[in-house]
Amino acid sequence: MPVDHIPKPSDGAVTGGFIALYTLAQIGAFVAFIPMLNLLLPLKAEAVDLSGKAVLLSQVMVIGAVVAGFANLAAGVLSDGTRGPWGRRRPWIAGGAVAVAATHGLVYLADGLWSLIAAVVAFQIALNLMFGPLNAVLADRVPDHQKGTVSALQGLALPTAGLFSAVVLAIALGGLAERFLITALAVPLLVLPFALLVPDHSEAGLPATRPRFSLGVLTDRDFRLAFTSRLLVQVSITLNVLYLLFYLQDVATLPSASGATAETAFGWLMTAGTLGGLIFGFIGGILSDRTRRRRVLVMSGGVLMAVGAGLMVAQPVWPGPLLAQIVFGIGLGLYSTVDIALVAEVLPDRSSAGRDLGVMNLAITVPQIAAPLIGLGVLLAFGGELRWVFAISAVFAFVGAIAVMGIRRVR
């Protein structure tokens, strides 16, 4: 039964059924790209070029991120202007979910630099055609007094995807083909129920004019500060995601008695950090609705991420990396969850929510370009010493955390 057939609360709040399916769809969207970035693509780069894996990974990530930025902005503009029986967002969400599954197969089959680049480009286009319109649903459909609660559940998507990557892919499964297949199947299974069962009436009452490509929303001071904060923190996140496995292989001293490999240690670190992020992210989202003080919670999350990245520099001997990733994960869960609600409130115009969130998404995709370049520059400057990459990560997280406190429209 379509979720909108469930009686609606009189205050305009979204229903429990809507929230449940939307949360599952968000988890599916994050499962689409978190395992790809932190495990599948690094392992594929290693399989294609063992000796040059870090450089190859950086090259592929930069090109893919450029494509992702344009694709997400295009998806936002296109879905803002889409009209029809399926509404503005649903056609793009459903079609993108199926395409993401197919492009996982392309990445797996790639056997060289150019085929891997082509596969990642196709993957990023499919991902962002799904992800941009899905993110716009929060601004379209959820009233302000529920944004923190829905964001608390939506914020579970990132750490849950990390848990999927750590437990299912890194620990439970051993073959690269199995890892790609399970991920490809999980995405449409989680995303399509929302796209198929929840009617989209977000275009009701909006002007018939179609939004255009524009970066004009960056002239809004509060939006610009939220963008800057997310941009800086995402550089920190991307550096941690990209180089954690290589850090465990080449820098960390793992417990010799346990016989742990870098991949299994990666799985356990991701699991520990994810569990911390799940708990604190959920609590933070609920508190941000009840207190309506989102900025200080976002700032606290960014500061904790900076502390965690700093511990990676200072304590490479076990259990230092474990403690570092727990602290980083707690900060990431808190920051990412509450920041979702903060950004949804900062948007100046509902009719162009998809486009403006596409602009905001540049704060995620630009770091996917910048972070590999920064990481590569640091590695070249410091003789391949990975600990300096995490030192830079700590600086970006801290500055990004402080930036959010200048926002005025949201407390």
PLM regions: where:
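Helix-loop boundary and gating motifs at the non-cytosolic
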Residues: 6-65, 224-229, 233-259
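Structural signature of the two symmetry-related core transmembrane helices
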Residues: 89-105, 296-311
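Intracellular juxtamembrane helix-capping segments at the cytosolic ends
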Residues: 41, 129-142, 334-348
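Helix-to-loop junctions at the C-terminal end of transmembrane segments
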Residues: 71-86, 280-293, 379
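Glycine-rich segments within core transmembrane alpha-helices of 12-TM secondary carriers
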Residues: 67-69, 148-170, 361-372
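A membrane-interface helix-boundary motif in multi-pass transporters
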Residues: 88, 171-186, 259-260, 377-397
